[in-house]
Amino acid sequence: NIMKKQFVIGAGLVATVAAALVGCATGPSSPPAAKAPTDAEIVAIMKASFKDSPSARLTRLDQSPLQQACTEASRTGKPLDDKLREQLQAAAMASVKYPTDGKYLGDWKRGEAIAQNGRGLQFSDAPGATAGGNCYACHQIDKAEIAHGNIGPTLWNYGKNRGQTEPILKYTWTRIWNTHAYNACVNMPRFG
């Protein structure tokens, strides 16, 4: 008899808790979410939050056709169609300016300093100030540097592993100048 009472009380408690939970799940909840802002509204907010300066123009916020296509591909989850991707990559390849003297390599110490430097193209910079590459933000280049990113592939021993033939040097130059020549929607910025 006592066990029956305990079972009935337990079952009643479970039923009460279940009813309360169902009420929470189906009852009024928080107010409906606000309508998501449009792309135009987002761009207007971004532009209003930046100052135009000689070293950092507001036009930098205007997307190129490549950026527009890649933004749309990212938003929809649909990759670029082959024809558009090929057109965008061909335009990127055409933008590359190779060294007129044919020298792809320079002072490696100066190159290391540029790779380490993340400064540049900020509104507070003097017009024409040299910008750094900030390569270490995404790549490992030297094993001695422990503060490096891993978004991009390691570049440790890049030249040693690949050699310094004309095709490799030209490929590397192109990758740095405008990496979109090889991958339209890559995250690496253009440095040319």
Q: Where are the language model's segments positioned?
A:
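Local sequence-structure signature of Cys/Sec-based thiol-disulfide redox active-site neighborhoods
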Residues: 123-134
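Residue-level signal for alpha-helical transmembrane segments in multi-pass membrane proteins
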Residues: 15-23, 143-146
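A glycine-rich, coil/turn loop motif that links secondary-structure elements
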Residues: 101, 127-129, 190-192
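Bacterial N-terminal signal peptides that target proteins for export
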Residues: 2-13
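Post-cleavage N-terminal segment of exported redox proteins
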Residues: 4, 18-121, 175
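Extracytoplasmic electron-transfer domains, predominantly the class I c-type cytochrome c fold
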Residues: 36-37, 41-42, 49-53, 57, ...
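A short alpha-helix capping/helix-coil boundary motif
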Residues: 13, 87-90, 150-151
